[in-house]
């Protein structure tokens, strides 16, 4: 048995997996950049006070918490929204609005590892701060969708609005705690628990709320759902306003979606539109979640600032995309035999190619030619430059295609074209 193993809930990524992750990361970055979002990063750890501000001390058991040498309580970040809110207040509060930021980084949660759920995981997400216009919500939704289209992932997006149920709760004079309890049961899809809680509230308040709640939850579909629900909730003014806000947002979303008011999102700071995106992989279906949170900056003692954003679960995206091979683009440069003169020529050729931005590997083991070619073949390197005395004296080098076995002489002046 090996003495040291990786910590529970973490992973080592082999070179082939890292290449695939980099390909997907690059494509997602391309989409974020196309919307002119600017990349930032924040510390890996923050004060525990900051990390627990949204949820309270009960989150402690879900985090990696420690004290520094100054006896200050710190925690590894479980997500980026709190850190970005702090960063915004520290650095961007006087910047012209909207402020459009994105990030790609690792996060940490102390939870039981299972399929698609790790103690160290990667998130890629965005925050758009400063605009409360419906088109800002649509911008974020469209960017999340475009990213997954860019990587050719099959997915389904569900969009809802917390204001619809909130309007029902207000009409029946439910407390904030009662509304939060109902929303958390909806988020967990615990319908039996929901029925029990609603029944208890009905008995205590002598009201009939269950029917309206389930009417909202059960009505799903395209944009026509909004008009149907407006009829059913005509006397619920706040709910109708939320439906009209959602309709204004969807005016700018040209992609297919499912309206679903059963999206409650586990975090309590969401205030309006919410959405979730699902892949096809069982056990790792939800790959993205987001929405509007207009009170978050204020919660962290900043000026009231409307905000909307989302985060991809990058590891879940990797589980949901079809396996693919990354083409090996490196060029292997090897002398036909061991010789200081030929090694020097190989070094100069490698430097010329590297200076032009190409990936080049030199034979560093002093192998005989056949073994060097076997090494290149095992690594999946498709192009090998073989440097021989006679060829180099004529300003040429041999190019071997490892896929076809074909070999030809090319001019040294032409090596940048291979």
Curated annotation (Swiss-Prot):
One of its GO terms (molecular function) is histidine-tRNA ligase activity. It is an enzyme of class 6 (ligase). Gene3D superfamilies: Anticodon-binding domain, Bira Bifunctional Protein, Domain 2. It is found in: Cytoplasm. One of its GO terms (cellular component) is cytoplasm. Keywords: Aminoacyl-tRNA synthetase, ATP-binding, Cytoplasm, Ligase, Nucleotide-binding, Protein biosynthesis. One of its GO terms (biological process) is histidyl-tRNA aminoacylation. Pfam families: HGTP_anticodon, tRNA-synt_His. Disulfide bonds: none annotated. PROSITE patterns: AA_TRNA_LIGASE_II. It catalyses: tRNA(His) + L-histidine + ATP = L-histidyl-tRNA(His) + AMP + diphosphate + H(+). It comes from the Archaea. Its EC number is 6.1.1.21. Belongs to the class-II aminoacyl-tRNA synthetase family. This is Histidine--tRNA ligase. The lineage of its organism: Archaea, Methanobacteriati, Methanobacteriota, Methanomada group, Methanococci.
């Amino acid at each position: 048995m090996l003495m040291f193993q990786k910590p529970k809930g973490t992973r080592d990524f082999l070179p082939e997996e890292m290449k695939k992750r980099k390909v997907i990361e690059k494509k997602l970055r391309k989409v974020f950049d196309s919307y002119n979002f600017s990349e930032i990063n924040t510390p890996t750890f923050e004060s525990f006070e900051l990390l627990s501000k949204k949820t309270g001390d009960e989150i402690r058991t879900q985090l990696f918490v420690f004290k520094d040498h100054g006896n200050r309580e710190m925690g590894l970040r479980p997500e980026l929204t709190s850190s970005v809110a702090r960063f915004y207040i520290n650095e961007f509060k006087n910047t012209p609005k909207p402020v459009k930021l994105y990030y790609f980084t690792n996060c940490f949660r102390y939870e039981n590892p299972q399929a698609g759920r790790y103690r160290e995981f990667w998130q890629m997400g965005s925050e758009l701060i400063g605009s409360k216009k419906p088109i800002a919500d649509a911008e974020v939704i469209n960017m999340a969708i475009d990213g997954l289209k860019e990587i050719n992932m099959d997915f389904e997006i569900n969009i809802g609005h917390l204001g619809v149920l909130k309007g029902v709760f207000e009409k029946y004079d439910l407390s904030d705690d009662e509304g939060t309890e109902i929303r958390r049961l909806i988020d967990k899809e615990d319908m039996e628990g929901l029925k029990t809680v609603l029944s208890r509230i009905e008995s205590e308040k002598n009201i009939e709320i269950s029917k309206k709640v389930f009417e909202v939850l059960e009505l799903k579909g395209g944009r026509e759902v909004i008009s149907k629900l407006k009829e059913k909730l005509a006397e619920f003014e706040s709910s109708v306003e939320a439906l009209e806000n959602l309709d204004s947002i969807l005016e700018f979303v040209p992609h297919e979606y499912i309206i679903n008011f059963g999206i409650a999102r586990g975090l309590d700071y969401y205030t309006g539109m919410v959405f979730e995106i699902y892949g096809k992989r069982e056990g790792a279906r939800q790959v993205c979640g987001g929405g509007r949170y207009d009170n978050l900056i204020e919660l962290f003692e900043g000026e009231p600032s409307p905000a909307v954003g989302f985060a991809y679960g990058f590891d879940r995206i990797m589980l949901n995309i079809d396996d693919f091979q990354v083409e090996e683009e490196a060029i292997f440069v090897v002398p036909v035999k061991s010789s200081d003169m030929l090694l020097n020529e190989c070094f100069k050729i490698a430097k010329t190619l590297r200076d032009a931005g190409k990936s080049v590997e030199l034979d560093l083991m002093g192998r005989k030619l056949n073994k060097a070619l076997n090494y290149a073949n095992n690594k999946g390197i498709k192009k090998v430059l073989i440097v021989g005395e006679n060829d180099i004296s004529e300003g040429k080098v041999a190019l071997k295609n490892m896929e076809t076995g074909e070999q030809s002489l090319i001019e040294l002046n032409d090596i940048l074209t291979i």
